[in-house]
Amino acid sequence: MHGILSLAALHLAYRHPADKPRLVCIAAYHHNIALRGFQHGISQVNDGNSDALYAFSCLNMVYVLAFFGPLCDGASVDSKSRILGEGWIPAIRGVDAVLHPVYDRVCRGPLDDLTKIGNWDQLNPDQQVVTHDDHFRSIQQVWESNNDACIYDESLYLLRKCNVYMKQFETMSSEARAEWGYNQDWSAPFIWLHATSKEYLDLLQQRKPPALLIFAYFGALAHALDGSWFMEGWGRSIILVVDELLGGYYDRWIKWPKDIIRIK
């Protein structure tokens, strides 16, 4: 309940900017109570609380994205570090990590549909011709002789897989979409956040150019979700920050993400 109330307060803060400070405080109050309940529940997992714990993890992801994104006071923190995932990516992945004990139980319950990701495991971007995949593949030359090339290759492969996952819905009939279930095209960027390696995320926080470039392409996919209030501005902000940090040498590789957000 407190998780729902925290999101409701954040959404009101988004809708009524003049009252944002008060509403964000209310949201934080309820979120802290929800977190304490979550931590207590994780310590004694059972069939009776597994669905509630999983539901909170979903609510928490939306809360974190809204709090660090459209509702963040940019003057109060290092905006570049924030945009590059400091705080919000660990908050999303951290909750996911402690949920492993409840996952099997959730798959047998009423929230099973939330756990399904369709044909994700069968997708292979190397065996399919998909729009824009050439842009993703082109950036591999940036790190081809880098000691961390395997880490970058894996993260890029997963991002290309997300692109394939999203593109299949563009030609899917409404009937097929209805049968697919909950996790459709919009879920792909979040799949990547959970699937990409800690080693890659460490390199991103170190602001290594190849890691930044991959993150800009993640921003291009995230920009497709700009119509959701809690994702508003995320894709654009990521691409702009990466562009500023990389400088002119990488212009030809970051051109496509900038084209996506219509920035020259």
Question: Across the structure, where does each feature detected by a protein language model lie?
Answer:
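Amphipathic alpha-helical regulatory regions
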Residues: 1-16, 29-33, 47-70, 89-95, ...
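Amphipathic repeat-derived elements
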Residues: 5-7, 12-34, 72, 127-137, ...
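Residue-level recognition of alpha-helical structural elements
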Residues: 20-23, 49, 84, 235
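Structured all-alpha helical bundle cores of eukaryotic regulatory proteins
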Residues: 24-39, 62-107
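C-terminal effector modules of eukaryotic transcription factors
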Residues: 84-103, 107-264
